[in-house]
Every structure is written in structure tokens, then in C-alpha cells.
A protein has these predicted regions:
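Active-site-adjacent beta-strand anchor residues
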Residues: 9-10, 98, 125-127, 146-149, ...
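Pocket-lining segment of extracytoplasmic ligand-binding domains
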Residues: 147-226
Length: 236
């Protein structure tokens, strides 16, 4: 009989691989007799970097190829940032575990550590999110919002290379990468309401693979799972 092996599907960005390796470590510590492998899968959202997400299908583009790999049984689990997940899933798949949440709010990184309220009139602020753009323009209609794509490192570099005054990113990713010192300000949810599931990592699998779901049972934050179910109903 062939020994059991778990394959985790992940995007290839440093943050995605940090999350996948964290899940791998959790699985291996709980199941030392089961080897775990990470399989890197490039998604449409990773391939298309020069067009705003809203124009090419939205944040679901970061999960499509991962879900296809699950359906083909190329991988057993797919690890996602929950903020990238669409509300609807393929019928044969499910989120089997939502892990403990990191800081769910958005963070400002600015030149000279300037806070949002202190940015000069007409300041150029980079972000790739329609959610952030609409809320920021409501709060500071004088700001000039610049489309921003790429992984965390790329977007942080663009603060310098594209002459931006500030950029806005999810705080959770910066914290996980050990870059808290780059954060100028955690933005209040009264100004910028975060995305559904922001800060949480979700593990997707096939509905009928009960044995695999059992492996994840004690990694699930039950309260957070209930919060995630309720968040799609929030007005934005």
C-alpha cells in the first residue's frame, strides 16, 4: 500500500509561501508520519500584473488555478489569504479550516513616516483595491490614488520608484513577513473598513475528502469561521 502524502497548493509569492509553509509546519507537527509537500501554482492574478484587478475579473483570479488543481487532484489542500476568496466556491470544494487571524486592518507606509491625515493635499497614494480607493476618496477626496499591483516587495519598492507619497497594504502580510517597522500607521476601520476575511488564512479542500478534513480539524478557529460566514453580509 502506497504511503500517504499531502500536497499543498500555493501561489509562489514570498507571502503566499510563508503561509503555505506555516500550514505545512502545523500539519507535520500534528502528523509526523505524513510527509507534506508544497506545490507552487501560478494564478492568473500573478501572471497579469499590468492591469487593475477590477478590469480582469477581480480578486478571484488569485484562486482559480488553485481550485482547478484541487479538482484535478493534483493537490490535497490549497492555502489562501481569505481576503482573496470569492463568496461562492465550486460545488465540490469547501473551506475546511480558517486559521487564527492576524491584524485584520489596512496599513499605511509613507515617506518620512507621515500619517494619513498629515499627507499633503494631492498626495499620490498607491493601492490596487477598489474598496480602498472608494473609502479613501470619501475620507480624503484630495488624494490622488495610483493603481498598484505586484507582491509585497514589489509594491513597497514602487513607493520609491514611482514617486509615490504613500502606499496602503494589508497589515497582516507585513507582520507575517516581519516588516512591522515599515508601517507608518494602522488605519482605523472607521476610515478604511478592511476586506472580508482580511488577516485570516483559509485551507480549501475537496468536500468528499473527509480524511483530509480531519487533519485540519484542530487548526480551525471556530469563532473566526463564523465571523467569516457573516462578513459577506456587511455593507461596503
Amino acid at each position: 500500500m502506497e504511503s500517504r502524502k499531502i500536497k499543498i497548493g500555493s501561489r509562489g509569492s514570498p507571502l503566499a509561501l510563508w503561509q503555505a509553509n506555516w500550514i505545512k509546519d502545523q500539519l507535520e507537527s500534528r502528523n509526523p508520519d505524513i510527509p507534506v509537500e508544497i506545490v507552487i501554482i501560478k494564478t492568473s492574478g500573478d501572471k497579469i500584473q499590468d492591469v487593475p484587478l477590477a478590469k480582469i475579473g477581480g480578486k478571484g483570479l488569485f484562486v482559480k488555478e488553485l481550485e482547478e488543481a484541487l479538482l484535478r487532484k493534483d493537490v490535497d489542500f490549497a492555502v489562501h489569504s481569505m481576503k482573496d476568496m470569492p463568496i461562492k466556491f465550486p460545488f465540490a470544494l469547501c473551506i475546511a479550516s480558517v486559521t487564527k487571524r492576524e491584524n485584520p486592518f489596512d496599513a499605511l507606509i509613507s515617506r518620512d513616516n507621515i500619517k494619513l491625515n498629515d499627507l499633503p493635499k494631492g498626495a499620490k497614494v498607491g493601492t490596487g483595491s477598489l474598496r480602498r480607493i472608494s473609502q479613501l476618496l470619501h475620507y480624503r477626496p484630495d488624494l490622488k490614488l495610483i493603481p498598484l499591483r505586484g507582491n509585497l516587495e514589489t509594491r513597497i519598492k514602487k513607493l520609491e520608484t514611482e514617486g509615490l507619497d504613500a502606499i496602503i497594504l494589508a497589515a497582516a502580510g507585513l507582520i507575517r513577513m516581519g516588516w512591522e517597522n515599515k508601517i507608518s500607521e494602522i488605519i482605523s476601520p472607521e476610515i478604511l473598513l478592511p476586506a472580508m476575511g482580511q488577516g485570516a488564512v483559509g485551507i480549501e479542500t475537496r468536500k468528499h475528502d473527509v480524511d483530509n478534513q480531519i487533519l485540519l480539524a484542530d487548526m480551525d478557529d471556530e469563532i473566526l469561521s463564523l465571523i467569516h460566514i457573516s462578513e459577506p453580509t456587511r455593507p461596503y
